[in-house]
A protein has these predicted regions:
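N-terminal leader/linker segments that precede catalytic domains of diphosphate-processing enzymes
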Residues: 1-68, 79-96, 100-131, 172-183
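Conserved acetyl-CoA binding element of GNAT-fold acetyltransferases
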Residues: 72-78
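Nudix hydrolase/Nudix homology domain
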Residues: 1-6, 135-183
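A short beta-loop-beta micro-motif enriched in histidine and acidic residues
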Residues: 68-69, 137
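Residues that recognize and position ribonucleotide moieties
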Residues: 73, 100, 142
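Short, basic/glycine-rich phosphate-binding loops at helix/coil junctions
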Residues: 69-70, 145
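Short glycine-enriched loop/turn motifs at secondary-structure junctions
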Residues: 74, 115, 134-137
């Protein structure tokens, strides 16, 4: 089952591609141009974000203003852009979606979601202020203590998994890096 729209034409020369094993020993069928030989790859997309938190344990969530899952709560996150590191992308998304000032921390969770062709990376990020300026993708940015988190109103399973891990680590007093596969 393909997760992406199939590539139909070569981006270099415009010739219709054929799907086959490339001649370089690759083990996956790829879109190969029969005219110029270009091999076209379709790989998972990286989603990068933060867990913005205050020392008292409250976390910042954003109420989505866009689809998918408009009107649901999420951590600030989005697709990584070309030319930026994962942590730069996470900081950018936090600024764009929440207008939050943060001090970036280490990677906290890496979640593989193969059914949608994505890898999600969340970083710990201490909030430097309780002032937020949500962007156009966010209806509201609000701080939540663990018992206040709207668990049934979270937009994505990756967000729920990450928050559960973060609160568990905080309770233990030690943060790790978590790798999760989501079927």
């Amino acid at each position: 089952m393909s997760l992406h729209t199939p590539i139909r034409h070569c981006s270099d020369c415009g010739t219709a591609v054929v799907y086959r094993l490339p001649d370089d020993g690759d083990t996956h069928e790829r879109a190969v141009c029969p005219a110029c030989g270009r091999v076209h790859y379709q790989n998972p997309l990286n989603v990068v974000g933060t867990i913005p938190f205050l020392p008292d344990g409250r976390v910042l969530l954003c109420l989505r203003a866009i689809e998918p899952r408009r009107g649901k709560w999420t951590l600030p996150a989005g697709f990584m852009e070309m030319g930026e590191t994962a942590s730069q992308g996470a900081a950018r998304e936090t600024d764009e979606e929440a207008g939050a000032q943060i001090a970036m921390g280490p990677l906290f969770s890496l979640l593989s979601v193969p059914r949608v062709g994505q890898v999600h990376l969340y970083y710990r990020a201490e909030l430097l202020s309780e002032q937020f300026d949500p962007g156009y993708e966010t209806l509201e940015a609000r701080l939540f203590a663990e018992h206040e988190v709207p668990w049934d109103e979270l937009a994505f399973r990756t967000v729920k998994e990450t928050l559960q891990l973060w609160f568990a680590d905080r309770q233990r007093g030690q943060f790790g890096v978590h790798c999760v596969d989501i079927a």
